[in-house]
Amino acid sequence: MRPHLEYASPVWDPWMDKHIKQLEAVQRRSARFVKNCWARTPGTITKLLNDLDWPPLQVRRKIARLTLFHKAIQGESAIELPSCIKGCNRQLRSTHHNRFTELRPRTEAYRNSFYCRTIKEWNSLPNNVLDIEKTSLFQKALTLV
């Protein structure tokens, strides 16, 4: 079921709570099915998800978005960064050299689009994660952040 939920997820990643909850409900039902546990006591689903070591789909989509952005920066993806995405002109002591200028969207939909959300999250990552060049190590480091 997960491959169907994650197909092209970096691009279509929902941002509205109601859509996020609908997707998480699918994973929760799948956990019940896999573990054959239909109890309705509080905390049952959380325990099932922890036993299965299934992080929330929203976390997985965030990692997928950041990984795709990392691949685009490293030239490992067919996706090229648009010309509107530029690195920061000046570096502060509190920022890193891989920082990008955040886009200034006018609409809520654009504010939650792939590039706007990903650049904001990218800029908040620690330097030691952003300095990783190999994609598999970068992805693993994201799971620890």
List each language-model region with its residue ranges:
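Hydrophobic/basic alpha-helical segments
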Residues: M1-V145
